[in-house]
Amino acid sequence: MKKYLALALIAPLLISCSTTKKGDTYNEAWVKDTNGFDILMGQFAHNIENIWGFKEVVIAGPKDYVKYTDQYQTRSHINFDDGTITIETIAGTEPAAHLRRAIIKTLLMGDDPSSVDLYSDVDDITISKEPFLYGQVVDNTGQPIRWEGRASNFADYLLKNRLKSRSNGLRIIYSVTINMVPNHLDKRAHKYLGMVRQSSRKYGVDESLILAIMQTESSFNPYAVSRSDALGLMQVVQHTAGKDVFRSQGKSGTPSRSFLFDPASNIDTGTAYLAMLNNVYLGGIDNPTSRRYAVITAYNGGAGSVLRVFSNDKIQAANIINTMTPGDVYQTLTTRHPSAESRRYLYKVNTAQKSYRRR
């Protein structure tokens, strides 16, 4: 994977964690870096379209694991929102064999995103004794899948009973789809509860907020990537929020991709950034509920854009917020923030946080 340009120092107030541009000002190096990644993704999508056909482009995202193999002729797609696993191939010879191999590897893949290149067809998926999907999928007998023998038997069952084919005019696409268990989201969340609790205690951030951010950002997908090159469970961008957190901790440079793909490191960094937003960048907001709404929105779109909703002067913006009720602050941010994504983001995270508080 291409090494990216380092980002020069930016005013911390103008940094968001999960996005790279929300109307805030970035320097030329960051713009060039972002444009370079956009070009890379555009080329990758174009290559997939050439091989698979028009409207058949599927690329990894925050809530979608997509891995190509077999010279891009086979792909595994886990939709963590819908709870479905779709294995497809356009291989002209022995398509069932290609599907079988991909099914087994997907069911038994480990929890090490840094070892997998989602932007190539390199077959770098290794079978793990502790599969990431263990408990999130059961076989045709209702049993979770840990060992290769059970995965192989399930693959044979799927190919015999659920194999489908369709034509897109260019290729015949063979596929099988596996439904994850109904509570797959909770199963994934449970994997990270210990890490969340540790970061919560370390930075004084509510566990329910961390979990709500993780659910909204990645649906607890540790392989999460985005077109803005945000990485991991909490979708941290190396050169913005990642660098800001490192600087606050007395570290130089930026967190590496492998660092942010490590679940514990990602949760620690994302939570540290939430604490910075709460205690420093938006610390002038007195009411804790109003400040929480501002922090949530800022995690997506930057603290600067949040304050500018109320005034172009940062101090005056905080003063205005302090005259408002929390309900009015919420209403303002969900209706007047210039970014539709940030407006929806506050609603989603706030709703998710309520559900975690009830548990």
UniProtKB/Swiss-Prot annotation:
GO terms for biological process: cell wall macromolecule catabolic process; cell wall organization; peptidoglycan metabolic process. Keywords: Cell outer membrane, Cell wall biogenesis/degradation, Lipoprotein, Lyase, Membrane, Palmitate, Signal. GO terms for cellular component: cell outer membrane. HAMAP family: MltC. Murein-degrading enzyme. May play a role in recycling of muropeptides during cell elongation and/or cell division. Belongs to the transglycosylase Slt family. This is Membrane-bound lytic murein transglycosylase C. It comes from Escherichia fergusonii (strain ATCC 35469 / DSM 13698 / CCUG 18766 / IAM 14443 / JCM 21226 / LMG 7866 / NBRC 102419 / NCTC 12128 / CDC 0568-73). The gene is mltC.
